From Swiss-Prot:
Pathway annotation: Quinol/quinone metabolism; 1,4-dihydroxy-2-naphthoate biosynthesis; 1,4-dihydroxy-2-naphthoate from chorismate: step 2/7; Quinol/quinone metabolism; menaquinone biosynthesis
Protein species of origin: Vibrio vulnificus (strain CMCP6)
GO MF: 2-succinyl-5-enolpyruvyl-6-hydroxy-3-cyclohexene-1-carboxylic-acid synthase activity; magnesium ion binding; manganese ion binding; thiamine pyrophosphate binding
Protein name: 2-succinyl-5-enolpyruvyl-6-hydroxy-3-cyclohexene-1-carboxylate synthase
Keywords: Magnesium, Manganese, Menaquinone biosynthesis, Metal-binding, Thiamine pyrophosphate, Transferase
Stated role: Catalyzes the thiamine diphosphate-dependent decarboxylation of 2-oxoglutarate and the subsequent addition of the resulting succinic semialdehyde-thiamine pyrophosphate anion to isochorismate to yield 2-succinyl-5-enolpyruvyl-6-hydroxy-3-cyclohexene-1-carboxylate (SEPHCHC).
HAMAP family for the chain: MenD
Subunit structure: Homodimer.
Pfam entry (one): TPP_enzyme_M_2
Cofactor note: Binds 1 thiamine pyrophosphate per subunit.
Cofactor: Mg(2+); Mn(2+); thiamine diphosphate
Superkingdom, natural source: Bacteria
């Protein structure tokens, strides 16, 4: 048998992608490159995998993040060797904090070409450090290493991912030649060593873990509890909300949950001494999902637990989410499974904290008076649920997500964010991945600095068919720093960095429709009309004064603090 390295490279990649499929991978994100040829060709040849392409590896990583976020499945990412690999790090860091399952398949030069001056060769082993939950550095494909070893080695890292979430890194060094027209059958005896696996269709080496046992309803039904709903799916949020209602407890909904309650606006009313004192009578906090937006809710939670309140945290993610290092009972299991066991019988609700909805209503009333129906960030946040309608919502990491946390009320909206590292990079790409996975219309709310940061990824919307509305709230720089005690003399130059840019020509560059409304009525008509009758992407630019939003927030907080 004549040796053909290109064919052997492809046999390894074919085996790899088939096992990835059996672990649940359905989407593969591919950037251009020559060294990654075996990976790209075999991903393309697999009839049950869907390919997504992008010329920018940083954007590609975030595209995969969005796909994984929305599909709740692992997503594979294929890049060539060199700095292409390094450009995945921002998305990998985000997945390391929020749990999305990325499978990073990085092509590499063989070991003899690393560290010796060869072109496009960097040290790729361990490049993602502890941002991945597991890594595997494969040898160059060869017949002395069995396909059985390849499968059990890949299975090990994928099982670790199945348990803990996050990204895994499989580094794939491919020797040349990379191109060949020879058939794989020249290595048929080698391929046949795993023919039973190929025929049976299951994972080569499987593992099972038992579920933890949650408490019974009898243990908690007489307690004064508070339910906190963080970053979860809409279905999980509804189940958690129903549980809180069944118990008669206050339910505090983070905007990432896509739901609201009679206790909305807590980031504002927690500044009122009377409201805070009433909520502080609780003796049990149950948090579903992670990554809360509200800093004041974090501070209140810390105060309560330090005073002796029990703190339970329900999340399938094994990783710690306990930034104040509090005593915490973490139930590592699916939220639905936990609730199904706990709520297995009727209970008489023990309603308490009955005065708090009054503060919530006052937050909403005063916010509307401050905004005065003008086109401003506070008014958009107040009307966000009606603007999004039945579409999905993606909230960027600007001042606006905090405004939604303060005054917004989302009534059953599938909501997505990147609130792990809370970076302003990759938001266009992540939102595109979410929409590709769900095939639903989407409203994307993003700040101007975030939009500038990921401008390349507007290319992902150029051939969009499903309606998407991208609203850029342009307050000319980082208006969020108006809420922080930064040195006033350096605030503009070193923090806000005003740019003076508009986004009309960015939209034209990528073939997107563009409008710049001047009233709330026009904004509503444009968004609702595009969802009803449009297709493709519409970029809506909303220009607001730089310090308007922070002034509105201060006015609202001052009013609510004074209530008795």
């Amino acid at each position: 048998m004549n040796h053909d390295q290109a064919v052997l490279n492809r046999i390894w990649c074919e085996t790899l992608f088939e096992e990835l499929y059996r672990f649940g991978v359905r989407d593969v994100c591919v950037a251009p490159g020559s060294r990654s040829t075996p990976l790209a060709l075999e991903a393309n040849a697999h009839t049950r995998l869907k390919l997504h392409t992008h010329f920018d590896e940083r954007g590609l990583g975030f595209l995969a993040l969005g796909l994984a976020k929305a599909s709740q499945r692992p997503v594979a990412v294929v890049v060539t060797s060199g700095t292409a690999v390094a450009n995945l790090l921002p998305a990998v860091a985000e997945a390391g904090l929020t749990g999305e399952k990325l499978v990073l398949l990085t092509a590499d030069r063989p070991i003899e070409l690393v560290g010796c001056g060869a072109n496009q060769a960097i040290a790729q082993q361990g490049i993602f450090s502890n941002h991945v939950c597991a890594s595997l550095n494969l040898p160059s494909p060869n017949t002395q290493t069995s396909l059985n070893w390849l499968l059990t080695s890949v299975d090990q890292v994928l099982h670790q991912q199945a348990v803990s979430g996050h990204a895994v890194h499989i580094n794939c060094p491919f020797p040349e030649p990379l191109y060949s027209n020879a058939p794989k059958s020249i290595y048929q005896s080698y391929i046949d060593t795993v023919d039973v696996w190929r025929a049976e269709g299951g994972i080569y080496s499987n593992k099972q873990m038992p579920l933890p046992m949650p408490p019974s309803l009898a243990e908690i039904e007489q307690r004064k509890g508070v339910v906190v709903i963080g970053s979860v799916t809409l279905q999980e949020a509804k189940q958690a909300h129903q549980f809180g209602a069944q118990m008669g407890w206050p339910v505090l909904c983070d905007p990432q949950s896509g739901t609201t309650s009679d206790w909305s606006g807590f980031d504002i009313w927690l500044q009122n001494p009377a409201a805070r004192a009433q909520l502080s009578q609780c003796d049990l906090i149950i948090q579903f999902g992670r990554r809360l937006v509200s800093k004041r809710l974090h501070q209140w939670l810390e105060q309560q637990v330090q005073a002796g309140c029990d703190y339970w945290y329900v999340s399938p993610d094994f990783e710690r989410d306990n930034q104040s290092h509090l005593p915490q009972q973490h139930f590592v299991c699916s939220i639905a499974a936990w609730l199904n066991v706990v709520t297995n019988r009727e209970v008489q609700p023990v309603a308490w904290a009955n005065e708090l909805p009054r503060f919530s209503a006052e937050v909403n009333k005063q916010a509307r008076e401050i905004a005065q129906s003008s086109l401003c960030e506070m008014m958009i946040a107040l009307h966000l649920s009606s603007l999004v309608g039945s579409a999905d919502l993606f909230l960027g990491n600007s001042l606006f997500v905090r405004m939604v946390d303060m005054v917004g009320q989302l009534h059953g909206v599938e909501t997505f964010t990147n609130r792990g590292a809370s970076g302003i990079d990759g938001l266009f790409a992540t939102a595109s991945g979410v929409q590709r996975a769900r095939s639903n219309p989407m409203l994307l709310m993003i700040g101007d600095t975030s939009a500038l940061y990921d401008l390349n990824s507007l290319a992902l919307y150029s051939h969009q068919e499903t309606p998407v509305v991208i609203v850029v709230t342009n307050n000319d720089g980082g208006a969020i720093f108006d809420l922080l005690p930064v040195p006033p003399q350096q605030k503009q130059a070193l923090y806000q960095m005003p740019h003076g840019y508009r986004f009309e020509f960015a939209a034209k560059q990528f073939g997107l429709d563009y409008v710049c409304p001047t009233s709330m009525t026009e904004l509503t008509e444009r968004i609702v009309g595009h969802f009803a009758h449009g297709c493709g992407a519409l970029l809506v630019e909303v220009n607001t004064p730089p310090n308007q939003a922070s002034q509105h927030i201060k006015q609202l907080a001052d009013h609510v603090r004074s209530l008795v």
